[in-house]
Amino acid sequence: MVRPRRAPHRSGAGGPLGGRGRPPRPLVVRAVRSRSWPAGPRGPQPPRIRARSAPPMEGARVFGALGPIGPSSPGLTLGGLAVNEHRLSNKLLAWSGVLEWQEKRRPFSDSAAKLKRTLPCQAYVNQGENLETDQWPQKLIMQLIPQQLLTTLGPLFRNSQLAQFHFTNRDCDSLKGLCRIMGNGFAGCMLFPHISPCEVRVLMLLYSSKKKIFMGLIPYDQSGFVNAIRQVITTRKQAVGPGGVHSGPVQIVNNKFLAWSGVMEWQEPRPEPNSRSKRWLPSHVYVNQGEILRTDQWPRRLFMQLIPQQLLTTLVPLFRNSRLVQFHFTKDMETLKSLCRIMDNGFAGCVHFSYKASCEVRVLMLLYSSEKKIFIGLIPHDQSNFVNGIRRVIANQQQVLQRSLEQEQQQRGMGG
């Protein structure tokens, strides 16, 4: 239930505008207009995002992946984000309109199709704060983004205004669907249209499944945040690739976050002497939630060389300081089974990055666990020494490698 828009302020220093001994001054809230463009030209306007009675985001913080944003205080967790509990009873209505977003259809349905959802919604602010919304559009378009993608935007969250969003409970299915998606670690990004004359260009929406509330964060550095969020969205689209590996939210497998998608290519020995066949598989790299693996400069195709694991014993010290990622391969099951069989027989994959690639990673090692049925990638932090070490190993043990490959060929020939 929404309380009246205004409530009497207590006089004295505790009032919203301060000033001991002054009579209480009523807080004027602009009426919500039915149009998003002003009727006529107006003079110079003050900043439309400002807090009168408190510094930005006082009593609120964003922690975890996004880092601290304000004074530490008890809050509610929003999948790595936290803000203080807010109740509508002490808030003032600042905006009313409609929120629209697209929701991925249920599994086993057309993956390319999405459901368009809309809900009437209202934005509320604390008493004593002012949020100019008279030029906001009456419909806001929201894009759902995994919160892990926002880890690099922590500094831009440190200076934001909070607003609480409330949705009219007319469409229970849409509201439940939105709560379910955002409760599973997604944030809403509302990009305001350029034709809108308001100064707000972007607003982030978060949801707490524990407190059942939606909180909006409006960064004061709108220009910097818009550029940053566009880069995040572009990087995500590049990772997904043409046509998309998935529709809607980024894939999460076993609580891991998709960091890269592309193609892995390698050559495996054939039963015929001195012959090999080229193989490739669509592949994806996952990292733990909250971790960042910069893959925007990774090539779309990685080339892997199969090496007997016994050749790598001298490189064990360099493996001790490596980052672990998980590889996942899709589509061609026969090719995948063949790769699993080879690597289960004592081979490791050495993935060399092209020198044309501008990323810092030059080599990573791929290992396979037949017990857990997973591929683990090791990215040594000391890339330079590892590259030199793997080259020496290959150069000095070429004969051993050749014998191992021939033995594998014989085993495959006997098995066929």
UniProtKB/Swiss-Prot annotation:
Ubiquitinated by the CRL2(KLHDC2) complex, which recognizes the diglycine (Gly-Gly) at the C-terminus, leading to its degradation. Ubiquitinated by the CRL2(APPBP2) complex, which recognizes the Arg-Xaa-Xaa-Gly sequence at the C-terminus, leading to its degradation. Keywords: Activator, Cell membrane, Cytoplasm, Membrane, Nucleus, Phosphoprotein, Transcription, Transcription regulation, Ubl conjugation. Residues 1-53 are annotated as: Disordered. The modification Phosphoserine is found at S53. GO terms for biological process: positive regulation of transcription by RNA polymerase II. Residues 27-36 have a biased composition (Low complexity). This is Prostate tumor-overexpressed gene 1 protein homolog. The gene is Ptov1.
